[in-house]
Every structure is written in C-alpha cells, then in structure tokens.
Amino acid sequence: MYRSVNNGVYRAGFATAQDKYDAAVTELFGALDWLEKRLATRRWLCGTRLTEADVRLFTTLVRFDAVYYSHFKCNLRRLVDYPRLWRYTRRFYALPGVARTVDLAEIKSHYYRSMKHINPTQIVPKGPALDFSLR
C-alpha cells in the first residue's frame, strides 16, 4: 500500500516526466480499485479490527479530494466516486478523537503554499466542500 497509494500520490504529483506520472497514476488507481473491491467483504482492511494499515490508508484518503486530486493531478476519479472507500474514510473519521485531528483548511494551506514548484502562485482553492460525517 505504501508504494502504490501513500507514496503513489507523491510519485504522481512530483513527476517531472509524462511516463513517470502516467505510471504512478495507473498504479495508484489500480490500487484504489483493488481496495474498493476488498472493502466489499470487510469493515477494515484486514478484517474486523482496525490496524496500522487502516491508519496509513486513512491519512492519504482524507486528503485525497482536497489536495491530491487537483494539486497532484491524481484526477482519474475522486474519493467520493468510490462508494466503499468513501464510507470507509467517513467511518474512520467518526472514530473517537479522529475528527479533531483533521483540519482540512490547514492541510490545503500547507500543500498549496509550501510546494512552489507545483503551485508557484500559492493560491489555495476554496473547494471542494467535503462532509466526512456519517449522515
């Protein structure tokens, strides 16, 4: 998961050649497709219990639509286009104490303002409006 997903978004975002970007995006979305299918039969990645693998995946998924989709050009599909991964992310977000650790405004500000080689104007987009609640 680290190479394909966690680091996959960075491999796409920092790619300096089309073939490197294409390879990273293809691998990333192949992994997301696989994870979407895997979550059809289990609550968490490794079954019924939360594991470190879930924590690692959540940190990438919670940033996906707000940052990686546009800033890193990981834009074949949004997280919300994956019903199981979207529900999984919202379920993780609803765990006690997790929501208070996620500040999307700060996350977006950090990514869009600190990576001048990707975003020379340092403009932080207003959207997307994301609701991680389990309504």
Q: Model features per residue range: what roles?
A:
Residues 1-135:
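C-terminal alpha-helical interaction module
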